[in-house]
Regions:
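Glycoside hydrolase catalytic-domain context in secreted enzymes
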Residues: 1-230
Length: 230
C-alpha cells in the first residue's frame, strides 16, 4: 500500500520495491506500468488517497523520484535497455487528488499558487527523475479537463519542464470530455486532446476512428501527429 509505505520515509526500500515489481513484471513480458501515482491528496473523502503518498508535496516528491528510478533502473532512459526494467508512468497529471468534496473525476478549483506549489512538485520530481510517460487525469482544473488542456500538456509539461516522453489518457479520458460539456461529440473531443498534446488514447477508440479525418479537415496538424509518434 503506497500510503503505508510513505509513512516509513524509507526511500531506498520504496525504490527497491518498485525495482522488484519491475523485475517480476518484465519477466512476464510487461514493458510498461501505470505507476507511480503521485497525486497529492488533502481530502480524506477521496477514495484513492491510499494509492499516493498523502498530503505533503515534499515527501511526495521524494517518493515519486524513488519509484520512477526503481521501475526504470535509474534516472536515465538508457537504463531502460536493461531487461529487468519497465517504463514508468507518472499519474494523474494533474491535481487529480484535488477533486471537490473528494468526488472522483470532479472539478478542481485551484489558485495558480496552490496548483504550482502544492500539487505540482511530485509531477516535476518524476519528470526530473526521467519518467518516460505521463497519464492525464480525468478531472477539470479551473473548468478545463486535463485531457484537453494545452497549457498543462504542452506549455507547462513539454515547454517549461522539457518533458520528452509521451502522454497517455486515462481510461476513455477523451470520450469523457463530452460529459464535461466542453465539446459536442467524440470527434471534437479527439481534436481537442490531440491539439492539447495527448499522444495516446487509452481504449477509447477516438483517435483510430476520427483522427485521419480531422487531419484532412485541418482540425489537427500533421506536425502534432508527427510529434506524438516520434
Amino acid at each position: 500500500m503506497p500510503l503505508a509505505e510513505s509513512c516509513s520515509w524509507d526511500l531506498e526500500r520504496m525504490r527497491k520495491s518498485a525495482a522488484i515489481a519491475a523485475d517480476e513484471a518484465s519477466a512476464s513480458g510487461i514493458a510498461w506500468t501505470f505507476a507511480p501515482m503521485v497525486d497529492i491528496s488533502r481530502d480524506a473523502r477521496w477514495g484513492r488517497v491510499m494509492e499516493g503518498a498523502g498530503e505533503d508535496p515534499y515527501l511526495g516528491s521524494l517518493i515519486a523520484k524513488a519509484r520512477v528510478e526503481g521501475f526504470q533502473g535509474g534516472n536515465d532512459w538508457r537504463s531502460l535497455a536493461d531487461v529487468n526494467t519497465v517504463l514508468a508512468c507518472c499519474k494523474h497529471f494533474a491535481a487529480y487528488g484535488a477533486a471537490e468534496a473528494g468526488r472522483d473525476y470532479n472539478t478542481s478549483e485551484l489558485s495558480q499558487n496552490t496548483l504550482m506549489n502544492y500539487y505540482m512538485p511530485p509531477y516535476l520530481a518524476a519528470k526530473e527523475a526521467g519518467v518516460a510517460t505521463f497519464m492525464a487525469s480525468f478531472n477539470e482544473i479551473n473548468g478545463v479537463p486535463s485531457t484537453g488542456n494545452k497549457w498543462l500538456m504542452t506549455d507547462l509539461l513539454r515547454k517549461d519542464w522539457g518533458f520528452k516522453g509521451f502522454v497517455v489518457t486515462d481510461y476513455t479520458g477523451i470520450n469523457e470530455m463530452v460529459a464535461h460539456s466542453i465539446v459536442r461529440n467524440d470527434k471534437e473531443a479527439g481534436e481537442l486532446a490531440a491539439n492539447a498534446g495527448i499522444d495516446m488514447d487509452m481504449t477509447g477508440g477516438i483517435y483510430s476512428q476520427y483522427l485521419v479525418q480531422s487531419v484532412k479537415e485541418g482540425k489537427v496538424s500533421e506536425e502534432n501527429i508527427d510529434r506524438a509518434v516520434a
